Amino acid sequence: MLFIGSCAGTFYAFDKHTGQVRWGYNIHQDGNQTSFHGNPLISESLILIGTDKSCAPDGIGHVYAFDKATGAVRWKYRTVGVPTDIAQIGSVVYAASFADELFALNLEDGSLRWKFGMGTANPDCELPSPPVVVGKRVLYAGFDNVLRGFDGKSGRELWQRSLGTHATTRLSIVGKSAYFGTSAGRLLRISADDGRIQGELPLPALPEGRILIAHDSLYVFLEDRERRAGYLIRTNLTLSQIQWVQKSSPDWSSEWPRLWNGLLLAGNCHGELNAFRSSDGVPQWSDKLKGCLRSIGTDGDGAPIYIGAQEGTVYAYSPPPLTSRLDSRSHERATEQQQGSKR
């Protein structure tokens, strides 16, 4: 199945082969909430997702646990709004809220295990950085510009590292190191054991979205807001240098570069889907769809590729053969399913 959240307030499960709706759940019935900003957590029988109404004063949010096959609500945990991914260590799951609170829930019934509030105001309604797990620890970068490490079981704070700048990407983990971008225009590598800075790389623009880690490399989207341009870069795990750069105008709208058959897939709000060779960044092909392309999903290296547009279309898209030339526009083999807008 293919799971997708609509910012019209419904969470869907599609048959990935036909696009037919297997089940859906309208979250409006549970209060003033509309959006799904984080990636779900999929277990053997459940799918967990957070909801929110941005920072609306009367808005709420939940963590939902749906039965993966039927869409039945197994449990839900109410809070002020959960726009982050859901992380997991064994029988405990973790998420963060717009109120800069990190909390842990029991996977079985959604009961609160522990909660840690940073106590930092969020006047600009920024999305919190999702918590990530490293072994039995949870890392979280708060709005107070501090990265903290917690014991996943007890919630005890183990260490903290003042960054002096805001995290602008999700944290990505390799071994015992956390990688992320900051509002100072840098990539950082920090030890998950004690918060020690292990590496730092200045960037030509602001890092954003989610970092892809593959082939001992990091692939990162950058945004130059002044010039309304975007970059896709590759660097190594030691952050010693930028290995290649690809520029786009307008900037990228998809959350992160998606790896597929050795290619990096990236979309923008002109409906352009681009494929770059991951080894050297050389463009391989591009195509034009309709809408602002926000999410790109794959099922391994197989086809089709699943693409969500902000205007409300989900595409099951068959890419051109790998031997096709750049800018081939002849493939219109996408099936569309209109189901509200996706962010």
Pin down the residues of each PLM region.
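Extracytoplasmic beta-rich repeat domains
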Residues: 24-44, 51-61, 73-89, 112-134, ...
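Short loop/turn segments that connect beta-strands within beta-propeller blades
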Residues: 15-18, 67-70, 106-109, 151-154, ...
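Structural motif
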Residues: 57-62, 186-188, 227-233, 272, ...
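An edge-strand/N-cap motif at the start of beta-rich repeat modules
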Residues: 1-4, 16-18, 30-31
